[in-house]
Curated annotation (Swiss-Prot):
Naturally occurring in which organism (per UniProt): Geobacillus sp. (strain WCH70)
Main location: cytoplasm
Functional summary from the UniProt entry: Part of the phosphoribosylformylglycinamidine synthase complex involved in the purines biosynthetic pathway. Catalyzes the ATP-dependent conversion of formylglycinamide ribonucleotide (FGAR) and glutamine to yield formylglycinamidine ribonucleotide (FGAM) and glutamate. The FGAM synthase complex is composed of three subunits. PurQ produces an ammonia molecule by converting glutamine to glutamate. PurL transfers the ammonia molecule to FGAR to form FGAM in an ATP-dependent manner.
Keyword Disulfide bond among record annotations: no
Active site: 54, 100
Binding-site list for Mg(2+) 2: 122, 273
The protein's name: Phosphoribosylformylglycinamidine synthase subunit PurL
Quaternary assembly: Monomer. Part of the FGAM synthase complex composed of 1 PurL, 1 PurQ and 2 PurS subunits.
């Protein structure tokens, strides 16, 4: 659309064209008041993306304020590209998780690939070198042809981008549930390492300093991507395919290396990724944070398509682009630095003192907006909240008691459930060993990477059981953070902090907003108890298809520090003769469990309870024992209960088995999903030391016969399965479903 054909300010108002951009009547009236006039088409577009939920968090900000965001090791909390935590030796870890759900529903390969690209840029824009990627994925049931297509292409997109850019994808989770049929979730997390003195922030300051554009040229891809991410998916969404960006990982690799060199230069004032809302958000946010203004000449913006209008250039979400502020008079050295990597850096504007975003095009001012109105002073809404009827119904139900007659068959059926089954089909497509720092590869409780030049390592995981959160958002929110911490502790690391991706439905529905509020309440409480502040994150709302919301899914990304690489622990049993202990008692808790879904085809009732004092005590005891060198293996008991966790401990070995004794209600002992529990193996010579440190129950020992044997105290056999048989079911489930014709 040329400038001549753009609607006039009067047309925009009278024909309510702003509504098509996602602005409400009230918001348009606010814009008129801020500007003291009607906005033109470019200005309306700029306000619409900056005031979208995706950029402004206007519906979620009041809720996000509940999170604890500070701690003695936190160097950077929410509000920048990524959060940063001190890990000693002058080093820090930077990490963040983000969603790319809507684009992945429409164009799964590019949607997932550019999600990975964007999160990498967030981390290196802080000056950190990305060392690892993780992801958290949700799809509908794997029996549907459409879900198979989305699953295969999302995984290929993540692999294609991460492998080319040379950053290992080391962990994550994949779950399947009908609630995600039309709206998959693709959350990508990146972890980086940085020296304290190299930390950069996205700030524009210093009147007269140069605003510089670096990276790929601007095209028409991704226009209104931020607005697209702030509305529900409908039958019409397919037509929005042009709103999905296209990624170039080789350009990203060059940009990464060049930016990591430029952050060491004192010529750099600030740097930010052009992410959601592209040039608009990066310029407005940097100016607002610095307390300055920015003016740019859009004729100077590198373009790869002819005849682009200011509206298109400002709203494009073309990938692999960064905005820099450089000291006046030092531009040449920055040009030369980027040229060394075959990249063009281009001066497109300067920092001003009037706190305005002023855009020129063909000699005329085409937009003039106060930067604070776009960034920190964007409107904030306190949405009404209402407890859903389904929640009251579930709370009133009698506890669900499953009827299980054949324990062996039930265990094999659970191992074949796609959510529990081996994800090897996924991670074998990822290069998880590139850069050779990966110590614990995908498949254990958490991934572990050593930190070169030190004796330390980092453990990292993504976790969230969305079924529990659907049944009871507050309890489920607590469990999500606690489970992430369990996975970190089982790896021999102390949990440091979290990043979160809050994936929910439409916040304008009071029942959905209630889910968001309650989940955040639960998460916040556990973060305080465990001392893991929230240092970064992302909100993805409007995850609905034709009015049906996904399960509320606040994904937790957590990083922990292994003080000494000798403490690194995995879930795999180590040698025959080691003693097997269980930490924690099983109760009859099956609401939202894998067993309930397997037997009933749906979930209902109450989520498992969690006692935070018990949780913290058990985690601390286990970590102390691991650090004392008396634990051979550790695994948390999660989806599928004790039997599934025990099977995973033996399936991770070469030829080992286990013989354990259980008593009481066998179904609960084997399959209940009671929280705060672990399976631990200990060498016989460490038995006394271990039992002094940890309150645990001795239940059996590791064998060398390749069999999982579960007996009652009377000697009656409950389960006797060869590890090979279990492994073939567990490993074959996902490939088998993908091959089958629905």
């Amino acid at each position: 659309m040329s400038l001549l054909l753009e609607p006039t300010p009067t047309m925009i108002k009278e024909e309510k064209l702003y509504r098509e951009m996602g602005l409400t009547d009230e918001e348009f009236a606010m814009i008129e008041k801020i500007l003291g006039r009607l906005p033109n088409y470019t200005e309306t577009g700029i306000f619409s993306v900056m005031w979208s939920e995706h950029c402004s968090y206007k519906n979620s900000k009041p809720v996000l304020k509940k999170f604890p965001t500070e701690g003695k090791h936190v160097l950077q909390g929410p509000g920048e590209g990524a959060g940063i935590v001190d890990i000693g030796d002058g080093l820090a870890v930077a990490f963040k998780i983000e969603s790319h759900n809507h684009p992945s529903a429409i164009e799964p390969y590019q949607g997932a690939a550019t999600g990975v690209g964007g999160i990498i840029r967030d981390v290196f824009s802080m000056g950190a070198r990305p060392i690892a990627l993780l992801n958290s994925l949700r799809f509908g049931e794997l029996t549907s042809p459409r879900v198979k297509y989305l699953f295969e292409h999302v995984v290929a997109g993540i692999a294609g981008y991460g492998n080319c850019v040379g950053i290992p994808t080391v962990g994550g989770e994949v779950q399947f549930d009908a609630a995600y049929e039309g709206n998959p979730l693709v959350n990508a997390m990146c972890v980086g390492i940085i020296r304290h003195e190299d930390i950069q922030r996205g700030i524009a300051s210093g009147v007269g300093n140069t605003v510089m554009y670096v990276g790929a040229k601007t095209g028409r891809d991704g226009i209104h991507g931020a607005t697209f991410a702030s509305e529900e998916l409908t039958e019409q969404s397919e037509a929005k395919r042009p709103a999905v960006q296209v990624g170039d990982p080789f350009m990203e690799k060059l940009l990464l290396e060049a930016c990591l060199e430029v952050v060491k230069s004192d010529a750099l004032v600030g740097i930010q990724d052009m992410g959601a809302a592209g040039l608009t958000s990066s310029s407005a946010e940097m100016a607002s944070k610095g307390g300055f203004g920015i003016e740019m000449n859009l004729d100077l913006v590198p373009q790869r398509e002819a005849g682009m209008t200011p509206y298109e250039m400002m709203l494009s979400e073309s990938q692999e682009r960064m905005l820099l502020v450089v000291k006046q008079g030092r531009e040449q050295e920055i040009y030369e630095l980027f040229a060394k990597y075959g990249l063009e850096a281009k001066a497109i504007g300067k920092v001003t003192d009037d706190k305005m975003l002023r855009l020129y095009f063909r000699g005329e001012v085409v937009a003039e907006i106060p930067v604070d109105a776009l960034a920190k002073d964007a409107p904030v809404y306190h949405k009404p909240s209402k407890e859903p009827a389904y929640y009251r119904e579930f709370q009133a139900m009698e506890p669900y008691v499953p009827a299980v007659s054949n324990y062996e068959e039930t265990l094999l059926s659970l191992l074949a459930q796609p959510t529990i089954a081996s994800k090897e089909w996924v991670y074998q497509q990822y290069d998880y060993m590139v850069r050779t720092n990966t110590v614990v590869a995908p498949g254990s409780d958490a991934a572990v990477l050593r930190i070169r030049g030190t004796n330390k390592a980092l453990a990292m995981t993504t976790d969230c059981n969305s079924r529990y959160i659907y049944l009871d958002p507050e309890t489920g929110g607590k469990i999500a953070v606690a489970e992430a911490a369990r996975n970190i502790v089982c790896s021999g690391a102390k949990p440091l902090a979290i990043t979160d991706c809050l994936n929910f439905g439409n916040p304008e529905k009071p029942e959905i907003f209630w889910q968001l509020e309650k989940a955040v309440d639960g998460m916040s409480e556990v973060c305080r108890v465990l001392g893991t502040p929230v240092i970064s994150g992302n909100v993805s709302l409007y995850n609905e298809t034709n009015g049906e919301a996904i399960y509320p899914t606040p994904v937790i990304g957590m990083v922990g520090l292994v003080e000494d690489i000798r403490h690194i622990t995995t879930q795999a049993f180590q040698q025959a003769g080691d003693l097997i202990y269980v930490i924690g008692e099983a109760k009859q808790e099956f609401g939202g469990s894998e067993l309930q879904k397997l037997l009933e085809g749906r979930i209902f009732g109450k989520a498992p309870e969690i006692d935070l004092a018990t949780e913290a005590k058990r985690q601390q005891e286990l970590l102390t024992a691991i650090q004392a060198g008396v634990v051979a293996s550790a695994h948390d008991i999660a989806e599928g209960g004790f039997a599934v966790a025990l099977a995973e401990c033996v399936m991770s070995t070469n030829g080992l088995g286990a013989k354990v004794t259980v008593d009481g209600d066998i179904t609960s002992q084997l399959f209940s999903e009671t929280q705060s529990r672990f399976i631990v193996s200990v060498k016989k010579e460490n038995q006394e030391k271990f039992e002094k440190l940890v309150e645990a129950k001795l239940i059996g020992e590791v064998t060398n016969d390749g069999t999982l044997l579960v007996e009652r105290a009377s000697g009656e056999v409950v389960i006797q399965l060869s590890v090979e048989q279990m492994r073939s079911v567990w490993k074959g489930a996902i490939p088998c479903l993908l091959k089958s014709k629905a």
